[in-house]
Amino acid sequence: MLPLLLPLPVTPPPPLPSPTLTLAPASAPRRRLVLLAAAAPHHHHHHRRRRVYRRQRAAPTQTRAPRRTLSASNAARGEEDLEEAIYEFMRRSDKPGAFPTRAELVAAGRADLAAAVDACGGWLSLGWSSGGAEAGRASSSVGVHPDYPPEAGAAAAAGGASDLAQGAVWASSREAEASPSGRQPETEEEETETKFGTGLDGMLTRLQRERERVRPPLPRSSDGAGGERDNVALMGQSGAPSHSATGGRYTPKVPDNGNIHSYHPQNGALEHNKSSKSLTNDAWRTWSLDKGGFSDFQAAEIHSTNSRKSFRHDGLDILAQDDVHGPSNGVAVHDYDINDVDSERDDIHARLQNLELDLTAALHTLRSRFDKVISDMSEGDGAKAPNGLSDDWEFEETKVMQAQEELRSIRAKIAVLEGKMALEIIEKNKIIEEKQRRLDEAEKALSELRTVYIVWSNPASEVLLTGSFDGWTSQRRMERSERGTFSLNLRLYPGRYEIKFIVDGVWRNDPLRPLVSNNGHENNLLTVT
């Protein structure tokens, strides 16, 4: 029938009594096939049992959730894709360090991610209980692991991405195998969530506990004490410290040997190498205290005097030998003389240099211990331990390198402080020089003064002296002696002066002195040589 319908656009035929056949548009061939298949049973009876199914398509605005398969690799790939999408959402959100809640995903227009997490379940939905709002607020307030400072920021978020990937594999393996206790996985997840908390904090804590669970014990050396010290140095004082769960709250454990002098969670001190003679306990204590709260110091806050102080922070009593002697507000009281500034500055430089040498020696010791532990484990059957030890070693090495960076920063601050002190000293020296010049001039002027002894020998009851030595502005009383004469001492510069006596209120001249006339006035002449 197609050849008969092709000429229709050129010459339309007259209307016929028979029904006209209309072809379906070319853009919808599926509908045409459906119509032909539906019309087939009228002519062919043997196609009655054949049914045509149409695939139902989902709405284009909704993303299909990843389907679970029996293959562990496919499930892992699906969860990895979902984790990448969630991580991208976290990176672009206002809280990159907090795992998003269901309400946050729906509010941001990502209901598809919320549905995908609900469908995936397991590790990704641990923080999504019925109290989603409370969990969301808890995860938002915590944000990152409590053992890391809040200023870690983007670094914590970036580091959390790798932990998310590890957690996804761990969660998929837990879902694939049955529970060892015979209970449902949901029940175990609820108990774990109640025990360790929800949100990103609980996830990171569970990952750390799982890593410690699968880590075999370290081989002990010949002497038990030495092996225990090495284990404590590499494991107990690592960057991710062990925790003790007490009612959902985790408190960092302090070793019994008391080698941690700083109360900052991230700034724990390394154990000293007992065989190394170059390490100084005083220097390490100073560095720990500076890391703990005295990083922003001034030059007057560093002293060579030793005192013992007890610090209390978060329930931890830490007794350290303090090199900073001063009140509790952080401002040191200095009692040194100004002449000892140079010696104190040299002492500060020497101590900073010793600290830098100690940090370098500690880093070398840490690396040598790690190499020794790795070599011992390679001989034994501990195949999985090097991975965990590598993380601890890298964290300890990072802490030492950060301490070196902070030490360099302190030295830079001291250099700036020395520059300011030099400028202040220069300014003070200029002021001192100016004052000294004025003092010299005054001393020179005083050295030119001469003492003049003036006497009135005539009888009188009261005699006053006035003259041009002060511009005739004052009248000085002369002292009467036992003989009845009046005298007065004056300090005058060399020169010629005019003087006159006031005897009992009458202006008079001394007949024994020379006279001079000035504008019709006669005065006595006084010459100072």
UniProtKB/Swiss-Prot annotation:
Residues 9-18 have a biased composition (Pro residues). It holds the Pfam family AMPK1_CBM. InterPro entries: AMPK1_CBM, Ig-like_fold, Ig_E-set. It comes from the Eukaryota. Residues 1-71 form a transit peptide. Residues 1-22, 39-77, 166-275 are annotated as: Disordered. Interacts with SKIPA. Interacts with ISA1. PANTHER family: PROTEIN PTST HOMOLOG 2, CHLOROPLASTIC (PTHR47434:SF1), PROTEIN PTST HOMOLOG 3, CHLOROPLASTIC (PTHR47434). Contains a C-terminal (448-529) carbohydrate-binding domain (CBM). This is Protein FLOURY ENDOSPERM 6, chloroplastic.
